[in-house]
Amino acid sequence: MGKEKTHVNVVVIGHVDSGKSTTTGHLIYKCGGIDKRTIEKFEKEAAELGKGSFKYAWVLDKLKAERERGITIDIALWKFETPKYHVTVIDAPGHRDFIKNMITGTSQADCAILIIAGGVGEFEAGISKDGQTREHALLAYTLGVKQLIVAINKMDSVKWDESRYQEIVKETSNFIKKVGYNPKTVPFVPISGWNGDNMIEATTNAPWYKGWEKETKAGAVKGKTLLEAIDAIEPPVRPTDKALRLPLQDVYKIGGIGTVPVGRVETGVIKPGMVVTFAPSGVTTEVKSVEMHHEQLEEGVPGDNVGFNVKNVSVKEIRRGNVCGDSKNDPPKAAESFNATVIVLNHPGQISAGYSPVLDCHTAHIACKFDELLEKNDRRTGKKLEDSPKFLKAGDAAMVKFVPSKPMCVEAFTDYPPLGRFAVRDMRQTVAVGVIKSVVKSDKAGKVTKAAQKAGKK
């Protein structure tokens, strides 16, 4: 077997008709987790429905339909392999809650793949002012997805024309530069998702195409296909050296064992014997054991979904949205208030001080008041445009002071990224996204269990 491949998460963004499903479907189909039986079943259904052209989008449509009906699909279906990586496709936009998922994300993307439709008229529509493409790319950048790959799709529809390709590369470079990416670090790859051309094997339809190139700290990296571009993602650094932050997804009471909180380690490590504090309540206790997939662990590291058993704490004292940390190393605390840069996406009216929508931050889901609108900024550069604006509307970026309606635990994005980004939800949609700059923490002490006191004396 050799060493486990590194896991990377990618998010696929782009305009509705850019061919995201077909392209993703193709990678999963050729390199991925869909077993032959499932594919044969899909192919048979496709043929019966007269969708003989089947082509990979059908795979993805099936998966999506199942997911939207709330059938949890075997997530293995959304995975594929490159020589270096296990790749998980987090979520393709178009899905209603895409923005929310990307922020509270069960997993942060290491790289975004922007799919641009090269067809005549299509490219222009996808990248126009109101385009979703702009919003998705801006979101990815704002939320700290620092690596980008651009795939220029549907090259078959323009007969692999070189000048059309160059024109799109030029326009797209300007576009991603405005969002904040440096085009020199971004591979541009011409593909046809429908025909599977230049996805896994180099195309033979474009004698002019010499391959993509990107700059990295280690020097220039070159390749031809989309799969090679994904394989050339720089390996993500997982934050094991930071203090522990583990937002709880659920808390179970298990007969004979006791209270078992469950969640994903975002930063740091959790080990048996550790004395942990839960914020915002401040309850401090000892971790008896840590397990994942019913196996005992010596330690849980970032990315692990773990369950852990705690002593002398009842299910009533801790809940989903609480954050677990090491009581001796920068323990998490309740936030009295916090300042954040907010980008208003789609709010029909004006937002003024006093507005109290629900914020989704890690696993917490709590109403927070826009207490003060401190300053309005340029979305791209962050430069200040005006002090104390009276209101904000769609498209604005601003620094805002928030006050939670009940105790919650959040962190500055620079300290603990997964706990420092949030979605603002109202009217059943994401109206804004935010990145937390600073937090005023509460110093109220909470309950310390006997187990914690004993462990502390050891």
UniProtKB/Swiss-Prot annotation:
The modification N6,N6-dimethyllysine is found at residues 3, 316. SUPFAM superfamilies: EF-Tu/eEF-1alpha/eIF2-gamma C-terminal domain (SSF50465), P-loop containing nucleoside triphosphate hydrolases (SSF52540), Translation proteins (SSF50447). GTP binds at residues 14-21, 91-95, 153-156. It comes from the Eukaryota. Residues 192-194 are annotated as: G5. Residues 14-21 are annotated as: G1. Residues 70-74 are annotated as: G2. Pfam families: GTP-eEF1A_C, GTP_EFTU, GTP_EFTU_D2. Its main location: cytoplasm. GO terms for biological process: regulation of translation; translation; translational elongation. The modification N6,N6,N6-trimethyllysine is found at residue 79. InterPro entries: EFTu-like_2, G_TR_CS, GTP-eEF1A_C, P-loop_NTPase, T_Tr_GTP-bd_dom, TRAFAC_GTPase_members, Transl_B-barrel_sf, Transl_elong_EF1A/Init_IF2_C. Residues 153-156 are annotated as: G4. One of its GO terms (cellular component) is cytoplasm. Coiled coil: none annotated. Keywords: Cytoplasm, Elongation factor, GTP-binding, Methylation, Nucleotide-binding, Protein biosynthesis. It is found in: Cytoplasm. Residues 5-240 form the tr-type G domain. The keyword Translocase does not apply. Residues 91-94 are annotated as: G3. GO terms for molecular function: GTP binding; GTPase activity; translation elongation factor activity. This protein promotes the GTP-dependent binding of aminoacyl-tRNA to the A-site of ribosomes during protein biosynthesis. This is Elongation factor 1-alpha. It comes from Eremothecium gossypii (strain ATCC 10895 / CBS 109.51 / FGSC 9923 / NRRL Y-1056) (Yeast). The gene is TEF.
